[in-house]
Amino acid sequence: MGLRPDGIIGHSLGEVARAYYNGRISQEEAILSAY
């Protein structure tokens, strides 16, 4: 179909994963904010 998302949203831990995937936070920040 050729569809490409403009962005990704998340909820709860999904927000952390989204921020990491989009390059907004580092891996260390993602791990620390999840715990």
UniProtKB/Swiss-Prot annotation:
Enzyme class: transferase
Cross-referenced Pfam families: Acyl_transf_1
Catalytic activity: acetyl-CoA + n malonyl-CoA + 2n NADPH + 2n H(+) = a long-chain fatty acid + (n+1) CoA + n CO2 + 2n NADP(+)
One function term, GO molecular function aspect: fatty acid synthase activity
Principal cellular location given in the protein's record: cytoplasm
Subunit structure: Homodimer which is arranged in a head to tail fashion. Interacts with CEACAM1; this interaction is insulin and phosphorylation-dependent; reduces fatty-acid synthase activity.
Name the record gives this protein: Fatty acid synthase
Source organism per UniProt: Capra hircus (Goat)
